Amino acid sequence: MIESILSGAVRFRWLVLFLTAVVGAIGAWQLNLLPIDVTPDITNKQVQINTVVPTLSPVEVEKRVTYPIETAIAGLNGVENMRSLSRNGFSQVTVIFKESSNLYFMRQQVTERLAQARPNLPAGVEPQMGPVSTGLGEVFHYSVEYEFPDGKGAKVKDGEPGWQSDGSFLTERGERLTDRVSKLAYLRTVQDWIIRPQLRTTAGVADVDSLGGYVKQFVVEPDAAKMAAYGISFEELAQALEDANLSVGANFIRRSGESYLVRADARIKSADEIARAVIAQRQGVPITVGQVANINVGGELRSGAASRNGYETVVGSALMLVGANSRTVAQAVGDKLEEIKKTLPPGVVIVPTLNRSQLVMATIKTVAKNLVEGAALVVVILFALLGNWRAAVIAALVIPLSLLISAIGMNGLNISGNLMSLGALDFGLIIDGAVIIVENSLRRLAERQHHEGRLLTLKERLEEVILSSREMVRPTVYGQLVIFMVFLPCLTFQGVEGKMFSPMVITLMLALASAFVLSLTFVPAMVAVLLRKKVSEKEVRVIAVTKERYRPLLERAVARPMPFLGAALVTLALAAMAFTFVGREFMPTLDEQNLNLSSVRIPSTSIDQSVAIDLPLERAVLSLPEVQTVYSKAGTASLAADPMPPNASDNYIILKPKSEWPEGITTKEQVIERIREKTAPMVSNNYDVTQPIQMRFNELIGGVRSDVAVKIYGENLDDLASTAQKIAAVLRKTPGATDTRVPLTGGFPTFDIVFDRAAIARYGLTVKEVADTVAAAMAGRPSGQIFDGDRRYDIVIRLPGQQRENLDVLGALPVMLPAVEGQPRASVPLRQLVQFRFTQGLNEVSRDNGKRRVYVEANVGGRDLGSFVDDAAKRIAAEVKLPPGMYIEWGGQFQNLQAATQRLAIIVPLCFILIAATLYMAIGSAALTATVLTAVPLALAGGVFALVLRDIPFSISASVGFIAVSGVAVLNGLVLISAIRKRLEDGAAPNEAVIEGAMERVRPVLMTALVASLGFVPMAIATGTGAEVQKPLATVVIGGLITATVLTLFVLPAVCGMVLRRQKKLEKPGGELLEA
């Protein structure tokens, strides 16, 4: 069939060229539509269930909220893993599903299970599912702030919206903001009611998160003494506000034939109307809210805050919808914000702080630069070695055509163009088959022309093109099949590594398949069309000189093979020794151009104290000339996609372009060291320096933010905490450990209110009545809402901040006694019903699949991940004794490296068995098949030496390089063996067949090796964004092809000569060879 395709391509060459042009045009159109991203979407399918319960401690949250939800979700079909977090007043359960699951269907299933769990949850508690986004869904951050944060430099016109001469800020609605809380609450109002609703309409945006400022509230601050004097309870105050804030419909009336809708709108519209609301009557005199309480426009008891460049702000985050493209969504968000800016009130601005599309474009710029430079080098080599510009053009045209055809397949398979899918394309590797066919056609046309002594006729030329293509189609087909097979292991990857590398392998296979089809159709047709004139019989000088120097060495290798075999064995032994010194890591870290400084303080740190620490930290880091801006997110945002306690902050450090860095500062490691020096004097901090995407990536795959984690499982939290501290001490002593820390599960100061049940009973009260009074006074009780157009603000009853923190005031808090007819209602001080005491409680409780766990996390610097874990595991086993029932697991990126390595250990040998079987089918001799396979070890040896010389750890990226170079080595060996077998079939002696066959294949072997290796040179030496991910793969291929080429030209002929001579000795009397 293939021969028919070749003949048809030559005979109908103009039709083939026309169809190729059409397909190329379709490919160009598809390439323009190809979605662009940084890396493949590696996120797992998960659903977050967030539950806010302000009045419960971490242990109570675990017992009464987290556990019932986990129990309800357990057993749901498709659940792969489940982890949870219980903190003060907050529960988050993360359910991870199998990749084959339909996320929207699973969310429906979770909704049904949550309905089953609700009867087991505390009254009023409502679990909420997180947005339909991913762990890497935050594609755009922006800051909502005053154009002049403190009013300095602003144009002041009293009476007009903006800053006033007295330091206050006048809103467009005439509200005068005089204090810090009201100013920040105004920024939050702008974010929640102007920016967020518009931004949520952007295509590809799942939701918009808000953090910082204060959610505006109308706060009713009761005076406990006045309430006691009037005999009014907290419950009566709350009920009075709800009763005074009503809107009811009364159907309609008819008058003069017309219908009038009856409205009875008694909604409260302002703080003054709250003050005039009647609570009760005493002796016929109405008691209003204003008589027993102060009414202020204030803010929530917040759990999160944000700041930028040393000033408090509000930070918004656009969350990308699952399956959307980060570049297009981030660009759409940026464009939408530009429109929204026109609708902002005077004096308020939006400042973009993190835009994922900028990283995408910087990464793709690096990939495109490497592809163009690699293609240019390949074309130069083709021109230099073929010595015929027409032939070089034919081979070079396969490069853009294969890329365009691949784009059609990528769109069809929903693969984005990114660092992995496009970054591994080596056009030299892809066009190897085309180069072999073009080179053979060029050689045969020259030989036929020399034989005829004239220019060939059209018929002769076409016949020769068909014969030359047919001659090389067998090694080309089997060689391409072998290259396909060597990449099969990568398609067996699962989890994160599968999502990361499968698109790369599929794209490479699409390009190889495209080039292969073009080699059978387009290339013969173009050869028949372009190579019409006289073909030079003389080889280019480079090839001629190479052959001249090569022949005597080749003859020596065939005649005396043992020294060459000995050198090969020594090389393999040295490579095996060198590999023991090569480090291991899951994959190289992408340089995101920005940094993230995670700060953790002692558990008792309040959100306001965290902000007070963040502000000077931002100013200190901002003083570095290479830093463009610094912004911080402390605590938990409204959607709780990334919940943090009040004592933790993420400080995002946005760097300037490297061209603007100070002289002498060239690497990010130097910048990190300078940041550490700046933050070292800061007290009450534990810093972890990483990158925004890297941090979320680590957290996504292992539930932690660092490179590696030791997860400790058990039941007793005290034992878990003490064991974690011991392991952390061991890790800190292990070379390479940086930013080692143990999340503090305990040490959270707790103010306990202990009920005296006997006293409560003596006064005729119930525990609930006392508890409701405490909760309303301390935590606050919502008592309706005020509507302002589309906006709505809660009315909340709670004690003033200073009174809430004063034990004497709390002790004197009146608890109203049951009413006695005919007597004024009496009260009893709270201190007579309860006791106050301070204790140490838990900060958080974490669980994996229903099992309590604590972890120790660390980043790794100065050494590879694999050797660090090996070293640390030995030290922990020797120095830390685990209590009964407790066990540890290693998590983080090492977990993925381990899983991928174990899978490769099984799949790679199976693939090599398949390759050997394929070669045997192509060659028909077990001995010669084994001879070709000897190319693989020396190719791998070159890759190992290259990694050692460049001090690059072994990673999954490097393993793909080893796989690629193995395929090229086998292809070259197959091309050489095919030439030797042809001469044997023509009757040549073994030594003559080996020498002449090798001499004939010098040029194609050198060309395939050079174009494949030089195509990777730009990737190996690149320094742009994303280059670090490509370097291991490119380095391995270049180093491997150097040794593989030496093997193909010297060791392979030497081994082949030995095998053929042995077969000659075993020849039967009838001339048939015995199988060796």
Swiss-Prot record:
One Gene Ontology cellular component: plasma membrane
UniProt keyword DNA repair, yes or no: no
Subcellular location: Cell membrane
Transmembrane feature ranges: 14-34, 367-387, 391-411, 419-439, 476-496, 503-523, 562-582, 904-924, 929-949, 960-980, 1004-1024, 1036-1056
Keyword annotations: Cadmium, Cadmium resistance, Cell membrane, Cobalt, Membrane, Nickel, Plasmid, Transmembrane, Transmembrane helix, Transport
Pfam families, alphabetized: ACR_tran (PF00873)
Membrane topology designation: Multi-pass membrane protein
GO biological process, one term: response to cadmium ion
GO molecular function: monoatomic cation transmembrane transporter activity; xenobiotic transmembrane transporter activity
NCBIfam families: 2A0601
Family according to the record: Belongs to the resistance-nodulation-cell division (RND) (TC 2.A.6) family.
Purpose: Component of the NCC cation-efflux system that confers resistance to nickel, cobalt and cadmium. May form a membrane tunnel, which allows ion transport across the membrane.
Name recorded for this polypeptide: Nickel-cobalt-cadmium resistance protein NccA
Native organism: Alcaligenes xylosoxydans xylosoxydans
Gene name, Swiss-Prot/TrEMBL: nccA
